[in-house]
């Protein structure tokens, strides 16, 4: 915490902490790492952590309910928090516990099964996707474990592409990558400024968009 406050070690807070080491978390982590981001994955399941490490991902065995990461100076460049477990209680708790120290630039969680059924209960901010819960995302990764990039030529192109992806059950929109290579999470309540040359990043079945 001291390091984060005084900036002794911190050069930038663009690292990402992902709670949960499922196949969905791992494919997201590998993509972001390939694009130059530092990603740390935590999970209380030893086997899942070992699978992440085997994929070349920095991973720690951590129980969010009992383990404290706030004093870990090796995580002082983390500024984004993604809670991607299949347990909504763990996701909610992780956001509450870690967002102050590791989510200063953004903290996002998966929606619960109940929120998927009753979308009026989904908060306006802080969710990774408003249309896909852990089960849906896991099925997409199982059947189509691929991430695609589409170069956009206009905001109209973005809107038509999002519509096409949302209509395809086996595809999920993830990020907008700007010209500087920075990734912004797509949610239906996000006001994104789209420019020609931006890239739309999506998971799953490849579409002609």
Please provide the spans of the model-predicted regions.
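Cytosolic regulatory regions of ion transport systems
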Residues: 1-209
């Amino acid at each position: 915490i001291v390091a984060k406050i005084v900036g002794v070690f911190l050069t930038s807070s663009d690292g990402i902490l992902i709670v949960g080491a499922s196949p969905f978390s791992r494919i997201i982590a590998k993509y972001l790492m390939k694009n130059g981001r530092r990603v740390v994955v935590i999970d209380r399941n030893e086997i899942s952590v070992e699978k992440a490490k085997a994929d070349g991902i920095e991973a720690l065995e951590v129980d969010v309910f009992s383990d404290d990461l706030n004093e870990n100076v090796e995580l002082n460049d983390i500024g984004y928090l993604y809670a991607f477990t299949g347990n909504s209680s763990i996701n909610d708790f992780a956001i509450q516990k870690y967002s102050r120290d590791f989510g200063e630039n953004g903290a996002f969680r998966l929606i619960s099964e109940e929120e998927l059924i009753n979308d009026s209960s989904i908060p306006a901010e802080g969710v990774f996707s408003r249309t896909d819960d852990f089960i849906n995302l896991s099925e997409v990764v199982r059947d189509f474990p691929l991430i695609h990039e589409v170069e956009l030529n206009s905001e109209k192109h973005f809107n038509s592409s999002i519509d096409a992806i949302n209509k395809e059950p086996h595809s999920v929109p993830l990020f907008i990558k700007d010209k500087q290579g920075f990734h912004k999470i797509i949610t239906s309540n996000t006001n994104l400024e789209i420019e020609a040359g931006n890239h739309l990043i999506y998971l799953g079945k490849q579409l002609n968009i």
